[in-house]
Amino acid sequence: MARIKCTEMDHIVLNVSDVERSLRFYSEVLGLKGERVEEFKSGKVGFPSVRINDGTIIDLFPTKHAAPLEENKKTNGNLNHFCLVVGAEDFSGITEYLTANQIAIREGPVSRWGARGRATSVYFLDPDGNEVEIRCY
């Protein structure tokens, strides 16, 4: 594989100290629609999201679930990670491609929830230590 082609942003995960406050801000101030809010409130899912458009969401990840920043060098402030989408052809060789480019895979392939439902994802760090998720639906 020559290189992968990312086609769109899927989601951004923000570490938030107060999920309810963040939901109010993103829904009432910025006009984004809450998703999985009732499931979060009932304990069925670990975090809610707000939708930017049909293909992009912001996950509001409670900091109580995040590793402490001194232990978790992959995070920079409140950015947990961001996710890019690739096509099936690019994803089929993603682990070999990353390994060939001396990029260590932190996790995956693994099934995770995203802006359009479940998909298969791989996680790794960029040169500055930001966690990147690449996924294929």
Report residues per predicted region:
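A short, acidic/glycine-rich surface segment
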Residues: R36, H65-E71, G108, R112
